[in-house]
């Protein structure tokens, strides 16, 4: 017999459903649930008097071999490039096994996710689930970055470095076969996935190919090592041959040529441009114009996101430290000053909102903050709604188009750029269960639990001597998915196909899985999700004003206050 309850009571029991809205933290952004894959009246939930019990929502006879999942997240609100919807999520063997309706197929109809004796449960009611963030601009300066990044929902690191060397402080590069092998070994117990970038500075292919065969999934070109046209062309020729990505930080000083010369050297080949606005480095003053090229995958680093009253002031000191400059040398100060333009920093926010800039990343400990990639991405979304209004197709109470655009910037798009989207980057069946669970009031700021391959790797946790898990002080701590041998099984290292074919596993110590990064050379900007716009961009060299397709762009105004800020970090 059917039983009717109010929408409010339903929400209290099972969480919001189709058409309901949820405010993201203290921002002006409101998501609206597009569909609900659970069955009204047949929902499952865990706890005393709830449905997941023997003979009810939990099957008591099926074995794991018969398809029972290892873990279920019930009634979750999924926020992903694929949509914003409610569903149960099943996890098995560290992968997403099913998204839909969980329960006991013996007593419930149309079950996609069998729940049984083998199944652990997370109560996803009133919880938002996203894919783990992928940070493509990591300086491997300190292992402490892992925990800091996990605390904001980042589960994959792509970048380079060897520790606190001056080369690493300035450039995201792990140079040469020896360093690449040592860093793969050093990160074998890291609680995040790893992908390394080698040094893309050679006049002949040999030294570059050796680094890729050693396990680098890409090469980085950086002005501090000389962003020459020869280095660009040689790296791209090798990349096209061996299927890896090229990342570039172009020549601020325009010593080796201007922006037009770099574009000519790239010659329509796919490339990932770092901090494309320019404050992080690149052709002054017009590197931002490269974001309009169809073969360019443009990214931002987070110190310029969003544009605030403090952004310009803090950049000078950051530049001096990170790029080994001397404040007593006028030329060094002039070099640093040439990279900082409030006009283009403001436009960067707008280009993110228009889907011209496609990726957000950190530039960890080297002009960026590794624990704020997700947070700052949503701050940009907020200030753009505040200053520019709803996106086309959105409204004051429905920001789904904007939300899908911004979540894609740190999940699926970096995965596509670096050839790992078949494994991570979205909440889809068959992908690694790198999932972040958020309470809506803390969305984008402090996750409830971070799962790595379906295991709890990082979570908020109360006093270990408490009689329950919640007594103060509640702090973030590693959990079982980041301890013991689980550190090697829950996370992976990405390497190119040619490295696997070359037997790189036999040259390394440690038991961590090496998975293939692939298909990086045929992609263009049109393959990126919700962020594929390619307008013609022009920069006035005197005023730094920016035009899109001939129209003057008004950048965001430097904001004085932001959501997701200090009120969340008092304790």
From Swiss-Prot:
Reactions listed under catalytic activity: urea + 2 H2O + H(+) = hydrogencarbonate + 2 NH4(+)
Post-translational modification: Carboxylation allows a single lysine to coordinate two nickel ions.
Keywords: Cytoplasm, Hydrolase, Metal-binding, Nickel
Positions of the Urease domain: 132-571
Details of cofactor binding: Binds 2 nickel ions per subunit.
Listed cofactors: Ni cation
GO MF terms held by the record: nickel cation binding; urease activity
Residues at which substrate binds: 222
PROSITE patterns: UREASE_1 (PS01120), UREASE_2 (PS00145), UREASE_3 (PS51368)
Active site: 323
Any one annotated GO CC term: cytoplasm
Domain of life: Bacteria
Subunit annotation: Heterotrimer of UreA (gamma), UreB (beta) and UreC (alpha) subunits. Three heterotrimers associate to form the active enzyme.
NCBIfam families named among the record's database cross-references: PRK13207.1, urease_alph
Record's protein name: Urease subunit alpha
Gene: ureC
């Amino acid at each position: 017999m059917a039983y009717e309850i109010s929408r409010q009571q339903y929400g209290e029991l099972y969480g919001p459903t189709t058409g309901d809205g949820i405010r993201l933290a203290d921002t002006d952004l409101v998501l609206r649930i597009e569909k609900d894959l659970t069955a009204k009246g047949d929902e499952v939930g865990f706890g005393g008097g709830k449905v997941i019990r023997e003979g009810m929502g939990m099957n008591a006879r099926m074995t794991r071999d018969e398809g029972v999942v290892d873990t279920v997240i019930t009634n979750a609100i999924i926020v992903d490039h694929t949509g914003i919807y409610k569903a149960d999520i099943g996890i098995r063997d560290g992968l997403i096994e099913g998204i839909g309706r969980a329960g006991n197929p013996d007593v419930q109809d149309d079950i996609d996710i069998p729940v049984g004796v083998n199944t652990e449960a997370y109560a996803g009611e009133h919880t938002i689930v996203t894919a783990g963030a992928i940070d493509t601009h990591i300086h491997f300066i300190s292992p402490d970055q892992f925990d800091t990044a996990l605390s904001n929902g980042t589960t994959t690191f792509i970048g380079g470095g060897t520790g606190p060397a001056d080369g690493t402080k300035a450039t995201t590069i792990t140079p040469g076969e020896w360093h690449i092998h040592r860093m793969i070994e050093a990160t074998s117990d890291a609680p995040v996935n790893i992908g390394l970038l080698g040094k893309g500075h050679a006049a002949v292919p040999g030294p570059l190919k050796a680094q890729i065969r050693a396990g680098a999934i890409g090469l980085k070109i950086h002005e501090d090592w000389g962003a020459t046209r020869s280095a660009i062309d040689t790296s791209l020729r090798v990349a096209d041959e061996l299927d890896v990505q090229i990342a570039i930080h172009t020549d601020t000083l325009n010593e080796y040529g201007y922006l037009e010369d770099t574009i000519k050297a790239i010659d329509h080949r796919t490339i990932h441009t770092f901090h494309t606005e320019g404050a992080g480095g690149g052709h002054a003053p017009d590197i931002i114009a490269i974001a309009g090229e169809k073969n360019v995958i443009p990214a931002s680093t987070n110190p310029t996101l969003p544009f605030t009253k403090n952004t310009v002031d803090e950049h000078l000191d950051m530049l001096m430290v990170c790029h080994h400059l001397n404040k007593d040398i006028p030329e060094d100060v002039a070099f640093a000053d040439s990279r900082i333009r409030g006009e283009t920093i403001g436009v960067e926010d707008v280009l993110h909102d228009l889907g011209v800039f496609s990726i957000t990343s950190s530039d960890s400990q080297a002009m960026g903050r590794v624990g704020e990639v997700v947070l700052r991405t949503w701050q940009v979304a907020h200030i753009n709604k505040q200053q520019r209004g709803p996106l086309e197709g959105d409204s004051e109470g429905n920001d789904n188009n904007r939300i899908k655009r911004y979540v894609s910037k740190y999940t699926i798009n970096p995965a596509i750029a670096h050839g790992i989207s078949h494994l991570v980057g979205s909440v889809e069946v068959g992908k690694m269960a790198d999932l972040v669970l958020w309470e809506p009031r803390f969305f984008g700021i402090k996750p409830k639990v971070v799962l790595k391959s379906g295991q709890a790797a990082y979570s908020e946790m109360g006093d270990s001597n408490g009689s329950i898990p919640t007594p103060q002080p509640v702090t973030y701590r590693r959990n079982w998915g980041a301890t013991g041998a689980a550190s090697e099984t829950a996370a992976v290292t990405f390497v190119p196909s040619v490295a696997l074919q070359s037997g790189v596993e036999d040259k390394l110590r440690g038991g961590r899985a090496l998975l293939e990064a692939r298909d990086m050379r045929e992609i263009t900007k049109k393959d990126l999700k919700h962020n594929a716009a390619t307008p013609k961009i022009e920069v006035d060299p005197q005023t730094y004003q920016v035009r899109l397709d001939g129209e003057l762009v008004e950048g965001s105004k430097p904001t004085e206050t932001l959501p997701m800020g200090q009120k969340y970090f008092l304790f």
